[in-house]
Design a protein with these regions (language model features):
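Glycine-biased, small-residue-rich flexible motifs in mid-sequence functional cores and linkers
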Residues: 2-9, 98-335
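Short, small/acidic-rich helices and loops at N termini and domain boundaries
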Residues: 1-99, 287
């Protein structure tokens, strides 16, 4: 093991150890990481007061009365982190930190980037040109057909699909990707140990067995929430070269992803059927964006597929005005 590998192995153990402490949650660890403090250095500290204050937890009184007690506490905590790290390593779960070369460059440049990623499966997929395919949980037959068309058009083109493993369009994007041999990445809104939504275990197993990847920034044991899903959507948009909202409403979770795509200067692509209302809010949200393109299918299927493979807009790439208010899109970690 190289010195660099040993460094990040220790950081991973420390990260697992700290999140095992009662009262230590995502926001606390995120703030620590943003400030540039390394987790292993925090565990090494000789000052229990600094340790407790930084993590916003109350330590047992005995720890402050004896150096031996403090050292024993740290040794036990490190052993706990080592055990957790070993457990997740056995199921091919890695932690990739923001400062590592293995961290996706596309996510380093977004607003409020993840400071770490739990990655299960093929890490290479996070460094390959990818297309986020997103949409309604209550999809129609038309939505499923459009999803199949898009993914089939991505086959054998060196692209990766990205979605959120949710019911509806998301799961169909993963399933069609598996069918057509397109590597697929599922971004979770929960901890890596959680199977959500209920019944998604089979799709998740298929994703991994076919060379895909499961990704989340959330901690072990962390459950879902509406706020978490909005934050998850920024990772979908950030990781992708192009974002394709297949079937959605302007007031929906998918709309958050659309607006993140605009914030991050990604391409937005939307296929539509001949009977669609071109004045509808959803299509207008795409056409009003300088890097947005819509395609009527089946007539423009070839143009759609070619654009997905090689997106190009011969216009200025100025940042557009987003469609949702700041309050509706708020993702701040309240640091």
């Amino acid at each position: 093991m190289t010195e660099e590998q040993e460094y990040w192995r220790a950081e991973t153990v420390a990260f697992y150890a700290l999140q095992s402490l009662h009262g230590v949650g995502f926001r606390t660890l995120y703030k620590i990481a943003v400030q540039g403090t390394k987790f292993r250095e925090l565990i090494k500290t000789e000052d229990p007061k600094h340790f407790g204050k930084t993590l916003r937890i109350t330590l047992p009184t005995s720890i402050f009365n004896s150096e031996e007690e403090w050292n024993n506490f740290k040794k036990e905590l490190w052993a706990k982190g080592t055990s957790i790290a070993r457990t997740y390593s056995q199921i091919d779960v890695k932690v990739v930190f923001f400062d590592q070369d293995a961290f996706p460059n596309r996510l380093k440049s977004i607003n409020e980037p993840p400071m770490w990623l739990f990655v299960q499966g093929n890490l290479k997929n996070l460094h390959t040109n990818s297309v986020a395919i997103i949409g309604s949980r209550k999809a129609s037959d038309d939505g499923y057909w459009l999803t199949k068309l898009i993914v089939a058009g991505m086959a054998n083109k060196g692209l990766v699909s990205v979605s959120g493993l949710a019911d509806g369009i998301d799961q169909r994007a993963h399933i069609e990707s598996i069918r057509f041999g397109v590597p697929t990445v599922a971004i979770l809104g929960t901890g890596i140990d959680s199977n959500y939504p209920k019944g998604s275990e089979t799709v998740r197993e298929q994703i991994l067995s076919c060379g895909g990847t499961i990704v989340t920034e959330y901690l072990i044991g962390q459950s879902y929430s509406g706020h978490n899903f909005v934050q998850r959507n920024r990772i979908q948009a950030g990781l992708a070269t192009s974002v394709i909202p297949v079937e959605w409403k302007i007031k929906s979770g998918t709309a958050h992803t659309v607006n993140f795509a605009k914030d991050f200067n990604r391409f937005l692509v939307m296929p539509y059927l001949p009977d669609s209302n071109l004045e509808g809010s959803e299509l207008q949200a795409i056409t009003s964006y300088r890097k947005g393109k819509i395609f009527q299918v089946p007539d423009q299927t070839n143009d759609l597929v070619n654009f997905i493979k090689n997106p190009l807009i011969e216009e200025s790439e100025e940042s557009p005005t987003v469609d949702l208010s700041n309050g509706e899109r708020q993702i701040s970690f309240d640091l």
